[in-house]
């Protein structure tokens, strides 16, 4: 066995292996310092009604994850019993490092679970119970977890039958902000071969009626196609539909909504690495929310982050993102541009980590139907070195 230690800088990943007794330690950290012209402190931008923001130079918090995983027992049949625990720390830039309080930050345990994996009786599948990150699908440049079944519960995962992998999870709470505890059932079937290098996965979520007053049941359906070896990277296309509490799509939504409330979403994004020095990621998201009482809303998001390496360790990274929300009262728009000279000691590729970036994000003022002409605002940020890195900030 070996232990994997992941180290890095600023939303980046670096892996260093060395011998140990089946213990794995992983960490993630992002941190930085910055200012904004006219206000002094760094500002971050997100359009009201948009579910995400483009994150390069647009994250105003310290965030860390510290994870330990231990294989406790390996049986004669090859199955392995293991435990996993993760602590997370969150604190806003303009607050003292207290990691507590609604306006300051938090210290949590987003993962603490046990798993019995590689079971012959399940054709290599596994059993698990606890709180864990589970089947998370996200877009890196906007940190959008559009299909995320992370939860507190238990389940059966990746049981191979007839060339397909079947999974089922039962949970009660799937994110920090879920007010009503509702029983959620998640069914997944993966491995449909659609074309050379392409696979389809289907997922169905059913949310039972919660215990509070005026709550309802709901459901959501997701279909996702993944195309490997696409321009040197990977392409993902997902269609999602939900009703009632299922309108949360990737999460449990508002439990007071009934079947007259519906949400539709289309997600398309891909990575590319057409040469060793030129790579990036591009995304397009469209979501339509149907609500009673003329509370409908449409959200569209387009973004791209190309990276070109001038040398083996120095990149020029840019990010351009645009969000548009059509809602009661008119249409809102927000565009953001970021330029980031980047030191990348592990190589020139887009996904090479760690990275240290000196960031200059700019955005025009939010545009409304009666707004004045837009003007650009700029913030400068040169992040401080961070000792750990691991991809993603979970909401469980």
Regions found by a protein language model. Give the residues of each.
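Short loop/turn motifs that connect adjacent beta-strands in outer-membrane beta-barrel proteins
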Residues: 19-26, 69-83, 119-126, 160-167, ...
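A contiguous, mid-protein "functional segment" used to position or interact
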Residues: 332-343, 355-363
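Beta-barrel outer-membrane channel/assembly domains of diderm bacteria
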Residues: 2-3, 7-123, 271, 305-308, ...
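Solvent-exposed loop segments that connect transmembrane elements
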Residues: 41-49, 176-180, 212-214, 244-259, ...
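Surface-exposed coil loops of outer-membrane beta-barrel proteins
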Residues: 32-56, 96-110, 121-211, 378-388, ...
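Transmembrane beta-barrel architecture of outer-membrane proteins
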Residues: 59-67, 108-111, 149-153, 182-186, ...
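Detector for outer-membrane/organellar transmembrane beta-barrel domains
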Residues: 187, 192-327, 333-337, 343
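Transmembrane beta-strands of outer-membrane beta-barrel pores
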Residues: 31-37, 72, 87-93, 131-135, ...
């Amino acid at each position: 066995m070996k232990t994997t230690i992941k180290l890095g800088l600023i939303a980046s990943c670096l892996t260093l292996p060395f011998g140990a007794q089946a213990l794995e330690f992983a960490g993630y950290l992002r941190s930085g310092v910055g200012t904004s012209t006219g206000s002094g402190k760094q500002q971050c931008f997100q359009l009201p009604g948009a579910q995400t923001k483009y994150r390069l130079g647009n994250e105003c918090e310290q965030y860390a994850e510290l994870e330990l995983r231990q294989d406790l027992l390996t049986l004669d049949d090859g199955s392995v019993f293991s435990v996993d625990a993760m602590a997370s720390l969150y604190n806003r830039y303009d607050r003292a490092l207290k990691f507590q309080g609604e306006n300051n930050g938090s210290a949590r345990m987003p993962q603490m679970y046990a798993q019995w994996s590689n079971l012959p009786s399940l054709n290599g599948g596994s059993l698990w119970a606890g709180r864990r990150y589970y089947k998370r699908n996200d877009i890196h440049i906007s940190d959008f977890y559009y299909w995320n079944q992370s939860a507190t519960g238990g389940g059966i995962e990746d049981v191979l039958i007839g060339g397909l992998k079947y999974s089922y999870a039962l949970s009660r709470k799937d994110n920090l902000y879920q007010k009503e505890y509702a029983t959620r059932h998640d069914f997944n079937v993966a491995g449909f071969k659609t074309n050379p290098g392409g696979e389809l996965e289907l997922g169905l979520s059913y949310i039972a009626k919660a215990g509070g007053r005026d709550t309802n049941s709901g459901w959501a359906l997701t279909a996702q196609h993944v195309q490997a070896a696409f321009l040197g990277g990977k392409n993902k296309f997902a269609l999602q539909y939900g009703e009632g509490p299922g309108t949360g799509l990737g999460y449990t939504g508002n439990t007071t909504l009934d079947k007259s409330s519906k949400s539709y979403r289309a997600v398309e994004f891909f990575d590319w690495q057409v040469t060793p020095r030129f790579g990036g990621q591009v995304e397009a998201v469209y979501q339509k929310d149907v609500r009673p009482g003329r509370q409908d809303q449409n959200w569209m998001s387009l973004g791209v982050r190309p990276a070109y390496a001038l040398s083996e360790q120095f990149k020029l990274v840019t990010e351009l993102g645009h969000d548009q929300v059509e809602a009661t009262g008119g249409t809102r728009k927000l565009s953001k541009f970021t330029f980031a000279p980047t030191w990348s000691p592990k190589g020139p590729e887009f996904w090479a980590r760690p990275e240290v970036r000196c960031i200059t994000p700019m955005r025009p003022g939010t545009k409304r139907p009666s707004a004045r002409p837009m003007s650009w605002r700029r913030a400068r940020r040169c992040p401080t070195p961070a000792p750990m890195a691991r991809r993603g900030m979970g909401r469980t």
